[in-house]
Amino acid sequence: MIRIPAVAGSFYEADPVRLRKQIEWSFLHDLGPKSLPSVPQNKPPQRSNRFFVVPHAGYMYSGPVAAHAYYHLSLEGSPDTVIILGPNHTGLGSYVSIWHKGKWKTPLGEVSVDDEISLELVKLTEIIDIDERAHLYEHSIEVQIPFLQYLFGQNFKIVPIVIMMQTPDVAESLAEGIYKLVSSGKKDIVVLASSDLNHYEPHDKTIEKDNLAIDEIQKLDYKGLFRVVEEKDVTACGYGPIMTVLILAKKLGKKPYVLRHATSGDTSGDKSSVVGYLSVRFGD
């Protein structure tokens, strides 16, 4: 089965030439790394940065912030498999849904789903349903793929997982399953937590609320992040994916490094109602 892009032409350019230019614009932007990535031919023997938080809005808004995560990912070469955890914005499908086989198509080509890792995760966690419906119109995973294709071509596979039930218990179960796969060493696996931060408040208020969440991320405190989201009304859409990578980072002794925090107002100039964006790497 081939998953057809749902947001090409809206969240990012539908033309492949213009899309590559848009991705390069993201890397070179003042809010981005200000440099194009260069992927090494020979990977280091041990990957340091295995987990990332990356935003998922339209590239014209969040592309420069997202580019920071991808720049650091590029430094250690192409992984075998990228597990992409995203929130469910559509309400379709199961509580935790995986697209377990086939290919995902973007203007830059097709990328294969790692069916082996997908089925292993389903068995290990016992909370993931094989369910394509949740993915049909969901953008949180789709918008990550062109960045990955720009860096690595077709030399990687993906495991797309959409999370509707974003609770600490679900994050713990997902993290435990992913941890077993990563620590087995059978494949070089990277995990992306796709999330924006606070939504649709003035710039200063969004920065204030985002910082509450960022404080918990820097402490690797997934329950603290959940508490802040619930009690302080921080409207981060993908806190479930973030909680999962916080647990993984702690289990594998990785430290959080905030790469860039900004809002849509920083790129659009309109700071009256913005969305917060964050890139974080978890490494040695």
Swiss-Prot record:
This is MEMO1 family protein Saci_0089. It comes from the Archaea. Disulfide bonds: none annotated. Belongs to the MEMO1 family. InterPro entries: MEMO1_fam (IPR002737).
